[in-house]
């Protein structure tokens, strides 16, 4: 568990945090440049010192301004991966990985190297590596110090699109197989969608929202970052069954289910899906014959006029689903809070 209750002056703003983060999964730190994202993780790592408050990791006090406690970075057991890999140029990859390696991680070296796909790189110098390869080595080096927490400061920011696509699957594997909580600084919605369990949104040094990805994603706080034509819903689902005759997989959403193209996932596997509001249409009665495989019973929570369109907030199995319809359709269907209807979903994408 990471307890953050501190403040630190940042130019004309003051970074003020009072949140408790669980000791698992990935928490994305999101916001525009200058919001305080990097300043937050620098304070946690010990690179900077808050003027007030406390930072406590798993019961260990890292910083207590009132008591004059401020552990040095090397005593905090916090790993840090920077935007630029910062590898030692005169050490081969193997030497970089072993630099600062904890004794408890010696037996984990081969496993971690395999997990990050860097075994072919062990005898190469950093100067011969691509940007994505360097970042994988940097992540491996940080993990081999046996940290209780891993901080990643926009690790994909300096990479071009092909290198980002190369590194993203390795980060996804880490989230599944390495039981170390991570704080992931980013201003990329795509990275957050694929990696984060939780999101903390910062603005001018203040926390505007903090919670599960699907909750924050559907809140008004995210509206400035979401293009209107890309309004969408993020939902947690589990694998229910694989169709015996067709290459389709059913995903449980409350007491209903969605069909998607067949997934190579075991039953009960937890997944996250994204549904674009523009891919959801509404009907008052379930259609008798339709090519659309996914028709869910839903209740209208509210509706909002938006530049000639209507955003309809629906509840499905205790979760929020958004639909975008025209004012004409809203009036013809008499859309109002509490109305039960059916949502036809034309497309579903798997995010994690």
Swiss-Prot record:
It is an enzyme of class 7 (translocase). It is a peripheral membrane protein. Keywords: ATP-binding, Cell inner membrane, Cell membrane, Membrane, Molybdenum, Nucleotide-binding, Translocase, Transport. Residues 289-352 form the Mop domain. It catalyses: molybdate(out) + ATP + H2O = molybdate(in) + ADP + phosphate + H(+). Its EC number is 7.3.2.5. It is found in: Cell inner membrane. It comes from the Bacteria. Residues 1-229 form the ABC transporter domain. One of its GO terms (cellular component) is plasma membrane. Belongs to the ABC transporter superfamily. Molybdate importer (TC 3.A.1.8) family. Part of the ABC transporter complex ModABC involved in molybdenum import. Responsible for energy coupling to the transport system. The complex is composed of two ATP-binding proteins (ModC), two transmembrane proteins (ModB) and a solute-binding protein (ModA). This is Molybdenum import ATP-binding protein ModC. It comes from Escherichia coli O157:H7. The lineage of its organism: Bacteria, Pseudomonadati, Pseudomonadota, Gammaproteobacteria, Enterobacterales.
